[in-house]
Curated annotation (Swiss-Prot):
[4Fe-4S] cluster binds at residues 508, 511, 543, 550. Keywords: 4Fe-4S, Iron, Iron-sulfur, Isoprene biosynthesis, Metal-binding, Oxidoreductase. It catalyses: (2E)-4-hydroxy-3-methylbut-2-enyl diphosphate + oxidized [flavodoxin] + H2O + 2 H(+) = 2-C-methyl-D-erythritol 2,4-cyclic diphosphate + reduced [flavodoxin]. It comes from the Bacteria. InterPro entries: Dihydropteroate_synth-like_sf, IspG_atypical, IspG_bac-typ, NO2/SO3_Rdtase_4Fe4S_sf. This is 4-hydroxy-3-methylbut-2-en-1-yl diphosphate synthase (flavodoxin). Binds 1 [4Fe-4S] cluster. Its EC number is 1.17.7.3. It comes from Chlamydia trachomatis serovar D (strain ATCC VR-885 / DSM 19411 / UW-3/Cx). The gene is ispG. Its cofactor is [4Fe-4S] cluster.
Length: 602
């Protein structure tokens, strides 16, 4: 299955789906969704959190339903919300227990199921091979087990989300398609076919992954396959287990922002570790920033044009030492910054230890300075550690001047800067120059009036969308906050799977199944391991329901198995189980040592 990418976009046309008192779809505003972190059986606490989420701007709220106790709790939660005149739709999250879905649909507005575990067994990597006959029999079994829920949802007018998660595909699907984007898409389509056959259409789809590159490719592919079949169902967007803090916001904005800018997505969630309340302002800012980007689309001559990313041209790295084939980061320094900054402070902002000369992993490869400042003492000091480019020596291409893009003067330069004002103009630039091997440095300026979160989201959405398609050779960032610029630059490169300079953390946002304080444990593990080399991925997951699957590409996993107990994973394999939580962090360090990735902090 080809992985498509989208060059021009309006919002993808979808059917309207009713969820309680609101509608989701292309003719309606994009809705914000979150999930409670309270135990669903804690009715009072769950209702309080739902009310708080609505006050902050959440449109749809989901609760976990593990079994019949949670089904009964949902009845009380819904009654309490009605009594308080709170109309926010209530969604039940189902894994492994179809009977819970059948019962809870009576009292909720929507049911979310995971095709990877609703009927089939989750893949346990046993190596089982399915014959064509066995595969066909499994599909018949799926129809028999899934159709009662479809029939009841249709009869009661309730909605459903078919939510596929990368890494938690069924054994049957993984055996045939692998743990791949193709497997994710076909997992969703198998369930979609049952819904279509039963003339049930109040369906929303999601294709989540903790890896934004996988997530974006999966949504693009599913949208293409659905539209080829004229199944115009809405999409719920999210980067699952995005983590916490700035890194979590960047991951979410790279994935969700890219798709929103392409016209995909009807509901969104930023799955950040910690209180779900913290997700809502980020979602609001993300919708605001991507709406402003979409207003600059102009008239797209081929709306929702899906094509191979190869049509846009391939990325050529700027082959200047010390880069080689490394995707580089440059920071623009203005004459004001160079004239007014304290030299030591400026070097430290760039990641250079002025005492030892040591370079931080997130130090940019170089800086761009005004030619008139090249001989200044501060630039001479910077040049001892980093590459220095004169701003006037390299063409800066105007995004509005297409003639300039292909001029002889432009094409004869060793490389060029292209100022990225919007995603679609940049894609057109690369499409017109697809036969050129000239390296292009993507130049981004950030509005100094943006708040920190707005700046993070704006840059992540604009830059991430291009990096995910392999466009550009390096990045030039121009922002008054130099330290924030380099931090964001490398986080976005890491989120786009282009370059990894620090440890990456995958951590779930928490829900009613969570067995420990996710935020506190995640922060402690980060503090103990953040000095380790880039390229390492560590997952911290609240429970074993989704944990082992959703940390699909993590190297090491810390997963709650039962109250007070932790399982440790290497890749998909549980290697240490039922460790008392007070010992688990030390056991994780020991596991890192056993696998040769640990080093003592300096």
């Amino acid at each position: 299955m080809a992985t498509p990418c989208i060059q021009n976009a309006f919002r993808r046309k979808t059917l309207p789906v009713r969820i309680g008192d609101l509608f989701v779809g292309s003719e309606h505003s994009i809705k914000i969704q979150s999930m409670t972190t309270t135990a669903t059986t804690d009715v009072d606490g769950t209702v309080r959190q739902i009310c708080a989420l609505q006050e902050w701007g959440c449109d749809i709220v989901r609760v976990t339903v593990q079994g019949l106790r949670e089904v009964h709790a949902c009845e009380h939660i819904k009654d309490r919300l009605i009594q308080q005149n709170i109309s926010i739709p209530l969604v039940a999250d189902i894994h492994f227990f179809p009977q819970a879905a059948i019962h809870v649909v009576d009292c909720v507005d929507k049911v979310r199921i995971n095709p990877g575990n609703y009927v089939d067994k989750r893949n346990m990597f046993t190596g089982k091979i399915y014959s064509d006959e066995q595969y066909a029999h499994s599909l018949e079994h799926l129809m028999n087990k899934f159709s009662p829920l479809v029939e009841k949802c249709k009869r009661l007018g309730k909605a459903m989300r078919i939510g596929v998660n990368h890494g938690s595909l069924s054994e049957r699907v993984t055996q045939r398609y692998g743990n791949t984007i193709e497997g994710m898409v076909y997992s969703a389509l198998e369930y979609a076919e049952v819904c279509v056959a039963m003339d049930y259409h109040d369906v929303i789809f999601s294709m989540k992954s903790s890896n934004p590159k996988v997530m974006v490719a999966a949504y693009r592919s599913l949208a293409y396959e659905l539209d080829q079949r004229e199944w115009s169902y809405p999409l719920h967007l999210g980067v699952t287990e995005a983590g916490s803090g700035t890194a979590g916001i960047v991951k979410s904005a790279v994935g969700i922002g890219t798709l929103l800018s392409e016209g995909l997505g009807d509901t969104i969630r930023c799955s950040l570790t910690g209180s779900p309340i913290n997700e809502i302002p980020i979602c609001i800012d993300l919708l605001k920033q991507t709406t402003e980007l979409s207003e600059r689309w102009g008239e797209a001559d081929n709306p929702f044009a899906i094509h191979s990313s190869k049509q846009l041209g391939t990325r050529n790295t700027l082959n200047t030492p010390p880069w080689g084939n490394v995707y580089g980061l440059l920071i623009n320094l203005t004459d004001v910054q160079l004239l007014t900054a304290e030299p030591i402070e400026l070097l430290q902002c760039l990641g250079i230890d002025t005492t030892t000369g040591k370079i931080d992993p997130t130090t940019p490869e170089g800086v761009v300075v005004p030619k008139a400042m090249r001989s200044s003492p501060i630039v001479s000091e910077i040049e001892k550690h980093l590459l220095v480019f004169n701003k006037e020596d390299v063409p800066i291409l105007n995004p509005m001047n297409e003639e300039e893009w292909l001029s002889e003067e432009t094409l004869s330069a060793p490389f060029v800067y292209f100022e990225v004002t919007d995603i679609h103009t940049a894609r057109r630039f690369f499409s017109l120059r697809q036969h050129s091997t000239q390296p292009v440095c993507l130049s981004f300026s950030l509005d100094p009036h943006l708040s920190k979160n707005e700046a993070i989201i704006d840059l992540s959405a604009r830059l991430g969308a291009l990096l995910l398609d392999g466009l550009g050779s390096c990045v030039l960032l121009d922002f008054v906050d130099i330290k924030l610029s380099r931090t964001l630059g490398f986080l976005i490169l890491q989120s786009a799977n282009i370059r990894s300079v620090t440890v990456e953390y995958v951590s779930c946002p928490g829900c009613g199944r969570t067995l420990f304080d996710l935020l506190a444990v995640s922060q402690r593990i980060r503090e103990r391991t953040q000095h380790l080399p880039g390229g390492l991925k560590i997952a911290v997951m609240g429970c074993i329901v989704n944990g082992p699957g959703e940390m699909a590409d993590a190297d090491f996993g810390y997963v709650g198995s039962k109250p007070g107990m932790i399982d440790l994973y290497v890749k998909h394999k549980c290697v240490k189980s039922c460790i008392p939580i007070e010992n688990a962090e030390e056991e994780l360090v020991q596991l890192l040592k056993e696998h040769g990735v640990w080093k003592e902090p300096e």
